[in-house]
C-alpha cells in the first residue's frame, strides 16, 4: 500500500546528478534516486543543493490544475499508457499512429512536462540554503531545466509518498 505524506512541513535536500560538482556511477545514481542516500557519492563544495518540501495531495492537484489537468488530451493519456516500453517497439508503434493520435499524444506529453514543472515550483524552498522564488527554474537553460526538474520530481515523489514501512 502506498499513501501520500500529509505534512508539507517536511523539507529535504538534494543535489542533481548532472551537476559537475557531483560524481557518481550509474549504479550509485540509481540508488540515490531510489533512496535519497548520498553515501559513497562524491559531492564537491561547489555543488548546488536544492531544498524541497513535500507536497500534499492538494498541492499536487493544484499543480496539475495549473498545468492544464482539465484541458489535457484524454486520448493522449490513453495512448501514453498503452505505449510500449521498449524503445524500438515504441518507435514502430508511434509510426503507426494517425496524425490525430500523434498530436493527442504530444499534447499529453506537454501536459506532463508542465505538471512536473509545477510540482518542482511548488516544492522548491531554497538553493544553497538561500530562499528563492520558484520562478528561478524558468531561467535555467532548456537542457539543465529538464534534468533539474526531472530529478526534483523523482526525489519529490519518493519523499511525498510513503510505503507501508515508511509510516
PLM-predicted stretches and their roles:
Residues 1-17:
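Short, intrinsically disordered N-terminal pre-domain segments
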Residues 19-21:
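Intrinsic disorder/low-complexity segments
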Amino acid at each position: 500500500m502506498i499513501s501520500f505524506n500529509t505534512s508539507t512541513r517536511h523539507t529535504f535536500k538534494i543535489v542533481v546528478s548532472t551537476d559537475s560538482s557531483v560524481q557518481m556511477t550509474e549504479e550509485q545514481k540509481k540508488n540515490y534516486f531510489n533512496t535519497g542516500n548520498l553515501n559513497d557519492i562524491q559531492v564537491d563544495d561547489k555543488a548546488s543543493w536544492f531544498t524541497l518540501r513535500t507536497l500534499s495531495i492538494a498541492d499536487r492537484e493544484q499543480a496539475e490544475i495549473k498545468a492544464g489537468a482539465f484541458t489535457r488530451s484524454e486520448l493522449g493519456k490513453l495512448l501514453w499508457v498503452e505505449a510500449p516500453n521498449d524503445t524500438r517497439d515504441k518507435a514502430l508503434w508511434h509510426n503507426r499512429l494517425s496524425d490525430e493520435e500523434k498530436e493527442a499524444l504530444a499534447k499529453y506529453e506537454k501536459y506532463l512536462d508542465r505538471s512536473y514543472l509545477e510540482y518542482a515550483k511548488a516544492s522548491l524552498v531554497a538553493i544553497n540554503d538561500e530562499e528563492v522564488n520558484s520562478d528561478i527554474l524558468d531561467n535555467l537553460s532548456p537542457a539543465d531545466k529538464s534534468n533539474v526538474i526531472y530529478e526534483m520530481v523523482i526525489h519529490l515523489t519518493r519523499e511525498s509518498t510513503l510505503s507501508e514501512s515508511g509510516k
